[in-house]
Amino acid sequence: MKGSSEHGETSKQAPLGSSRGVSKGVSVLDLILRFIAIIGTLASAIAMGTTNETLPFFTQFIRFKAQYSDLPTLTFFVVANSIVCAYLTLSLPLSIVHIIRSRAKYSRLLLVVLDAAMLALVTPGASAAAAIVYLAHKGNVRANWLAICQQFDSFCERISGCLIGSFGAMVMLVLLLLLSAIALARR
């Protein structure tokens, strides 16, 4: 009889240890996703912020220039990605604390709120930039806006590529919110 009750006690403690392992795994995944989102937002902000192209027109003295700062939407894109990148970098130590102390509830709740705010910032920046990129490629016949990508092809390729990192960061922030919700629900 005594042997069977001891066996039952050990089996009750096994899920508790595995719960800590799962919690630590969630925290490690949180840290990895933050690094990926940092890379995406940083690359997008730098690439967009350094995008420009100059085309000569008849002579060397008359030139047409396209740069990201010509469009306020693309400037907002750079600012939004820079802010989100700075936040994600500053949140790394807190994410490391969650790996060490998986029971930190209030700091995880703070990260949920701030992650949601950063998602709310990067989403309109990326979406508005996507609309401008679409107009640059296709134009708008009704508004008499011509597509500029036939002339400024390098500029258009670069601003199109910048969207990838930003939309990737959006996905990472959504996954971070889901992971934090899972971690908070387990407590």
From Swiss-Prot:
Residues 49-75, 137-162 are extracellular. This is Casparian strip membrane protein 1. NCBIfam families: A_tha_TIGR01569. The keyword Cell membrane applies. GO terms for cellular component: plasma membrane. It holds the Pfam family CASP_dom. GO terms for biological process: cell wall organization. It is found in: Cell membrane. Residues 1-27, 97-115, 184-187 are cytoplasmic. Regulates membrane-cell wall junctions and localized cell wall deposition. Required for establishment of the Casparian strip membrane domain (CSD) and the subsequent formation of Casparian strips, a cell wall modification of the root endodermis that determines an apoplastic barrier between the intraorganismal apoplasm and the extraorganismal apoplasm and prevents lateral diffusion. The keyword Glycoprotein applies. Its main location: membrane. Residues 1-10 have a biased composition (Basic and acidic residues). It is a multi-pass membrane protein.
